Structure formats: C-alpha cells, structure tokens
Design a protein with these regions (language model features):
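N-terminal, positively charged/glycine-rich alpha-helical extensions of SAM-dependent methyltransferases
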Residues: 1-24
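Short glycine/proline- and charge-enriched loop/turn segments
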Residues: 24, 170-179
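Short, flexible, mixed-charge acidic loops at enzyme active sites
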Residues: 162-172
Length: 236
C-alpha cells in the first residue's frame, strides 16, 4: 500500500496533547465523548458479536471507546499518534483492571501495513475529520481487517446545518467541545466516505445519524445524517 508518513496535522496533535488531563473527566473537555460513547458502543454491539474477536481502535485517544470494547472483545489494540493521550489511556486501563488492551503509538498506515488482515473488528471514531488525507486512512483500515471483518466509522457531515450545529452550536454556544475542535473544510459527506470505502473493498451495511437533544443532554440514533453519523462496513 502506498502511504504517507505525515498524514496528520501537527497542530491537531498539539491540541489534543494539551488537554490530556481531561480525557477521563466526564464533565471536562471530552464531555461530549463520554455522553456519546454508550451509543457508539451499543451500535457496534448491535451489528457485531464481539466475544472472541480481535479489535483495533484507530485514533483511540485516552481510551474511552477502547475500554468499552475490551469489556466484550478478546483482545483490543488502541493506536494513536498523541503520546500524552496514550499515556493516560495506559494508566486508566490499569486502574480499570483491563488486561486485554494493548496501546501503541503509531499511525494506522504503519500499523496496518505491519498487521495486514489481523483484525476482526476495527473502529475509527471522530478521527477522519482531523487528518489531511482521510481516504488514505480508510484504505489503511481496510488493509488491517480480515475478509468478512467489520469496520465502523463516525464523523461529521459537511453542510450549513452541520456548521451551525457541530461547530457554532457545540463549540461556541453549548460548549460541548473546546473551541476550534473542528474545521468546516475537513468535514466529510457520507457519500465521500462511502466512495472511499468502496475503493477499499468495503461494503456498506448501515448508515445511521446521531442526534443530540440539548434539553436532556443525550444522543440517540436517527435517520437524520445531516450532522453526526456512523457507518458500518464489511470487508469483501
């Protein structure tokens, strides 16, 4: 697989490394991820039986989803380029007494080239909108998964509504995320992600929207994919 070793923005790594101490604070900078995580995990469980499975969590950060996966899967590997976030993830997994998690500081391109067709399940949540070449990430993810394996992506659509809700609303009004977390030009339409996936030999199984209710501060699945959405693919 032809790959680039610089498929990341240094300012993105710096940004996430600076707020490392807040990864496991449910009321801190990653408040929205803590609220969203049960929905993401349930979505994965509804589509894939995780027991006995080997999973890879791409862009794992502080390990919020990684730890959830480890409560069901046989072995989970979390990879990220943010060294400080991985340090937090490793310490927290020890506190949680989860011994079936491995963390590695690596790009998905490098990791999956070394571990081709290694995983049954791969998750790449809220990451694609933070890299220069998301199509390359999708291709690398496919390389690391076995034929018949499951891949899950979540990201944000690119349109006026998503700009108003995911950036203006979430970052500046509701303060669910730190200001500057997302750049509009880096957001991804579902059709674009599906096109990249098809090039990577991935078949779309499900596309679901994720809606936020600010009154009771909860996320739920919906048919509306105009802002946040998740996609489930099978390889082959």
């Amino acid at each position: 697989m032809k790959k680039s070793s610089v498929n990341f923005y240094q300012e993105e790594l710096n940004k996430f490394n600076k707020i490392t101490d807040h990864w496991w604070d449910p009321k801190g900078d990653f408040y929205s991820l803590h609220m969203l995580n049960p929905l993401r995990f349930n979505y994965i469980k509804q589509h894939t039986e995780l027991q006995t499975k080997k999973c890879l969590d791409v862009g794992c950060g502080g390990g919020i989803l990684t730890e959830s996966l480890a409560t069901r899967a046989s072995v989970v590997t979390g990879i990220d380029l943010a060294e400080n976030a991985l340090s937090v993830a490793e310490k927290h997994s020890t506190t949680s007494n989860l011994q079936n998690i491995n963390y590695e500081q690596s790009s998905v391109e490098d990791h999956c080239e070394k571990n081709e067709s290694e995983y049954d399940v791969l998750t790449c949540m809220e990451m694609l909108e933070h890299v220069p070449n998301p199509e390359q990430i999708v291709m690398a993810c496919s390389l690391g998964v076995k034929q018949g394996g499951h891949l899950y992506f979540s990201t944000i659509n690119r349109n006026l509504k998503s700009f108003l809700m995911a950036i203006v609303g979430a970052e500046y009004i509701l303060k669910l995320l730190p200001k500057g977390t997302h750049e509009y030009d880096q957001l991804i339409k579902p059709s674009e992600l599906d096109q990249w996936a098809r090039k990577a030999d991935l078949k779309l199984i499900d596309l679901s929207g994720v809606s936020y209710n600010p009154i009771n501060e909860t996320f739920k699945l919906s048919r509306d994919v105009s802002v946040n959405y998740m996609m489930h693919f099978i390889k082959g």
